[in-house]
Amino acid sequence: MAGKGGKGLLAAKTTAAAANKDSVKKKSISRSSRAGIQFPVGRIHRQLKQRVSAHGRVGATAAVYTASILEYLTAEVLELAGNASKDLKVKRITPRHLQLAIRGDEELDTLIKGTIAGGGVIPHIHKSLVNKVTKD
């Protein structure tokens, strides 16, 4: 019977230690800050789980990788659009600047083939339409 008393005493000590640990709670760190990126890893992970057909099973690193790719592409497009707006001496990036930036870059143009609302058209005059100056 002495064995039971010892186990009860040990259980009381562990519950007291667990209660003490709960009172000193660590501050939660987001997965985005752990990965060193700005895009929300948790939100992207949730959205990936909603779209996958394998019973919502998505690896933890898949969301981090996807978020970092999206952040890189966004930074690339914004940098090119900012350069386009700076060339036109305007402080605000418009859909026209996005259009000029995306269509000006060959790789982004192949990636983003859709129409950008309010983007206008890319200025281009075909060679055959240009008047040729002839010397007489």
UniProtKB/Swiss-Prot annotation:
InterPro entries: Histone-fold, Histone_H2A, Histone_H2A/H2B/H3, Histone_H2A_C. Its main location: nucleus. One of its GO terms (cellular component) is nucleosome. GO terms for biological process: regulation of gene expression. GO terms for molecular function: DNA binding; protein heterodimerization activity; structural constituent of chromatin. It is found in: Nucleus; Chromosome. Keywords: Chromosome, DNA-binding, Nucleosome core, Nucleus. Signal peptide: none annotated. Expressed mainly in meristems and dividing cells. In roots, restricted to the vasculature in the maturation zone. Variant histones H2A are synthesized throughout the cell cycle and are very different from classical S-phase regulated H2A. May replace conventional H2A in a subset of nucleosomes. Nucleosomes wrap and compact DNA into chromatin, limiting DNA accessibility to the cellular machineries which require DNA as a template. Histones thereby play a central role in transcription regulation, DNA repair, DNA replication and chromosomal stability. DNA accessibility is regulated via a complex set of post-translational modifications of histones, also called histone code, and nucleosome remodeling. The nucleosome is a histone octamer containing two molecules each of H2A, H2B, H3 and H4 assembled in one H3-H4 heterotetramer and two H2A-H2B heterodimers. The octamer wraps approximately 147 bp of DNA. Belongs to the histone H2A family. This is Probable histone H2A variant 2. It comes from Arabidopsis thaliana (Mouse-ear cress).
